[in-house]
Regions:
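A glycine- and Lys/Arg-enriched "phosphate-lid" helix/loop adjacent to the NTP-binding pocket
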Residues: 96-156
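Hydrophobic anchor at the beta1->P-loop junction of P-loop NTPases
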Residues: 5
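Walker A/P-loop
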Residues: 14
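ATP-binding Walker
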Residues: 11
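P-loop (Walker A) phosphate-binding loop of NTP-binding proteins
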Residues: 8
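ATP-dependent small-molecule kinase phosphotransfer cores
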Residues: 29-115
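NTP-dependent small-molecule kinase module
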Residues: 21, 131-196
Length: 196
């Protein structure tokens, strides 16, 4: 099973991804986490330089690189699927779509970039007002995390895509344990359904 935990910057994706993997393991399920962008790969290192404003590229190139970062790791993802792992993604192709829409790119073009990547069985969007995102991390923000108007557009993109793609929206503006319990309820129901 492939699960993506999505949302704008500082919505709690990393924390909730880690809690979900821990819970899955406690239930005897082989589970692992993958995060994107993955800054350890050659493309990931280039993305890091772009996000820190060290180098500038056209917006289309940036989104092609986000996709290429996943393609670099496609063999690893497929290997984990083959080994029957449940993979929980802290961002996956869904982020590229939502951020791309915020940059006025075509959803068809964005989807084509990721068309042959392994697709998720479940996508959970942690919804958070951008003003709260900005309060959660006030220092060392990347170029996207600093722009309130941009984050508002990204949030709008996630909500639109969620309704079109049957993604599940969870209110991320709650205590960590409450959000985790809501996510676990959704995931455990999906796991039961998959076993039937």
């Amino acid at each position: 099973m492939l699960i993506a935990v999505e949302g704008i910057d500082q919505s709690g994706k990393k924390t909730q991804t880690e809690l979900l993997v821990k819970k899955l393991k406690e239930k005897g399920i082989n589970a692992t986490k993958m995060s994107f962008p993955d800054y350890e790969t050659p493309v990931g290192q280039l993305i890091k330089r772009i996000l820190s404003n060290e180098i500038q590229v056209p917006i289309e190139v940036k989104h092609m690189l986000y996709s290429a970062n996943k393609w670099e790791l496609k063999p690893k993802i497929e290997e984990l699927i083959e080994q029957k792992y449940t993979i929980v993604f802290d961002r996956y192709y869904q982020s590229n779509w939502a951020y791309g829409l915020a940059n006025n790119l075509s959803i068809d073009w964005l989807e084509n970039l990721d068309r042959d990547l392994p697709h998720t069985n479940l996508t959970i969007v942690l919804d958070l007002p951008p003003k709260i995102s900005l309060k959660r991390k006030e220092q060392n923000r990347d170029i996207h995390e600093q722009d309130l108007e941009y984050l508002l557009r990204v949030r709008k993109g996630f909500i639109k895509l969620a309704s079109e793609n049957k993604w599940v929206i969870v209110d991320g503006n709650q205590p960590v344990d409450t959000v985790h319990d809501l996510i676990w309820k959704i995931v455990s129901e999906r796991l039961k359904h998959n076993l039937q």
